[in-house]
Amino acid sequence: WDQHGKTMESWNQGGLTYYRIAGPLVPTLFVNQFAYLEAAGAAPLYAKVTESTGKTAVLRTLKEYTHAKNSVWGVTARNREQNFALNLLLDPECDFVTLTGTAATGKTLMTLAAALSQVMDDRRYTEIIVTRVTVPVGEDIGYLPGNEEEKMNPWMGALDDNLEVLSRSDGGAGEWGRAATNDLVRSKIKIKSMAFMRGRTFLNKFLIIDEAQ
């Protein structure tokens, strides 16, 4: 702030605070990049770059998904990076998000929670399409019977595991309520094979590519 706050402008919009800053780091900032300041004795600042002209940049504070009141389908961010990820996944102006990290860091869980929130609650998209490359870890199990979705099931264990976590997050729904919710959720999720995607056009869909590497 000592270097970038001298000519700073700030304003509030939609419950979030915006800062227009100028300084030596501004030329290195790009849109949708996150900036944070964690100083001893002061409240931390977490923000996303929404505009960058080279001389000035606009930062917007984030919605804090680390708080239970802002949980997404029962999922709360456990750390700074997960909070950044949820802010991107739930931003309707951000069309393409890639998440990278070690195993068991919540990438698929957060993405699925964000997708369900925007399909079931906000009605922003009509359904969720999930796909991944069908590369076996060990020996190939050969030809699989069934339709496209049934053939994909052996590779969708992580999806099923995360759906189970999300359906159990509604503790007050009871067993019948959770079963009904689970059936409704699954009706909004379509599993597609990448082998048959060439030439397809998906309109108003939330597309998840798991294990994209």
Residue ranges and their predicted role:
Residues 1-66:
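Interdomain "pre-motor" coupling segment immediately N-terminal to P-loop NTPase/helicase cores
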Residues 74-93:
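N-terminal pre-P-loop "Q-motif" helix
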Residues 91, 120-123, 198-201:
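Conserved catalytic network of the ASCE P-loop NTPase/AAA+ motor domain
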Residues 93-98, 204:
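Pre-Walker A (Motif I) flank of P-loop NTPase domains
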Residues 99-101, 111:
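Hydrophobic anchor at the beta1->P-loop junction of P-loop NTPases
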Residues 102-103, 133:
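P-loop (Walker A) phosphate-binding loop of NTP-binding proteins
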Residues 109-183:
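Conserved P-loop
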Residues 185-213:
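Conserved RecA-like ASCE ATPase "motif II neighborhood" in helicase/translocase motors
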